[in-house]
Design a protein with these regions (language model features):
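Carbohydrate transferase catalytic cores enriched for Leloir-type hexosyltransferases
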Residues: 1-329
Length: 329
């Protein structure tokens, strides 16, 4: 998208570095500055917290969220320490800072005391060619891969890690299912993180309820999975943006999420909100299952709001950040 905005611009991609963090960081601090000296770009964009401190050109850094500071217990200790240090370096040395939400900007300004004018807010977009409403036949096809029969289901999409609050969702689903003639299944799609509390919550699920953890779903199955859920639940404790919420909205899902950090910026009035406790989530689930008209209304609103989030618009905001940084040379 940036290339289409500025056809005359030359975009140089750095080669993929090794998967080990130590090797990758060594390359970023030694190999990348050497590449910069050879290519002589106007701006370097580092898209994930860290930056080449020896680069002799303006560097723009993307900071995705501030939860490494505000909620370190939700991350592995080594990861939280590393990204806190990287964020401090970026705030101190970068020519420009890009964040995916106003909430992330405000948190970093509050925590590190930097000037908000240094930030450019660039909301993520969604690939509308992939994430869009699909017909019932496609929803049924995907349902057939989930091993839940013809049960309605509550869906979750994301990494199964503490920040996503999935154990509370499991307990909430069990409570919300009490008294239902036909309790919905719960399908937790995504890679496993390090959330041992989730294992304990799953172990306590009554035998008559159906829970599935299919891992990563094929990309082609995601629209059918999201659109086919009676409710797509995303009860996160905090996000820098919340891309699964936007992807679900684009597919016309009824989304239930929280008001933590950036999520209201994404959902607006097109999603349902709840607290982060199992009790609050359960109450919201019961209300949505009992109100098909509201679910339909939210689905319509979600599709409309999702259309306003595009990668072309995100690219335009990045261009602003690059121009501001280049002007500091």
């Amino acid at each position: 998208h940036y290339g289409r905005l500025v056809p005359a611009a030359e975009i140089v991609r750095a080669p993929a570095a090794a998967s080990r963090r130590s090797v990758r960081m060594a390359w970023e601090q030694i190999g990348l500055p050497a590449m910069v000296r050879s290519v002589r770009p106007d701006v370097v964009h580092s898209p994930h917290y860290t930056m080449p401190v020896l680069a002799r050109v303006p560097v723009v850094v993307t900071l995705h969220d501030a939860t490494f500071f505000t909620s370190p217990e939700l991350h592995l200790r080594s990861k939280a320490e590393f990204f806190r240090a990287a964020t401090r370096v970026a705030v101190r040395r970068a020519a420009g800072l890009v964040v995916p939400s106003q909430a992330t900007r405000d948190e970093i300004v509050r925590l590190l005391g930097t000037d908000s004018a240094r930030f450019t807010v660039a909301y993520h977009g969604v690939d509308h060619g992939r994430f869009h409403p699909v017909p019932p036949e496609e929803q049924a096809r995907v349902r057939g891969t989930l091993d839940i029969g013809d049960l309605p289901y509550i869906g979750f999409l994301g990494t199964l890690e503490p920040r996503k609050n999935v154990p509370a969702l499991v307990r909430a689903w069990v409570r919300a299912s009490e008294g239902m003639d036909r309790p919905p299944a719960l399908v937790l799609a995504g890679g496993r993180g390090w959330d041992t509390a989730l294992d304990a919550a799953i172990a306590e699920v009554p035998r008559h309820l159906t829970v599935r953890m299919p891992g990563y779903l094929p990309l082609d199955d995601l629209p059918g999975f999201l659109a086919g859920a009676t409710v797509l639940a995303y009860p996160s404790l905090g996000e820098g943006f919340g891309l699964p919420v936007l992807e679900a909205m684009a597919c016309g899902a009824t989304v239930l999420t929280t008001r933590e950090l950036s999520l209201p910026e994404v959902g607006g009035d097109a999603v349902a909100y709840c607290g982060t406790s199992a009790t609050a989530i359960a109450e919201a689930l019961r209300e949505l299952f009992a109100a098909p008209e509201r679910r339909e209304s939210l689905s319509v609103a979600a599709k409309e709001r999702a259309r306003t989030f595009t990668w072309a618009e995100a690219a335009r905001h990045h261009l602003v950040a690059y121009e501001k940084a280049a002007a500091r040379r």
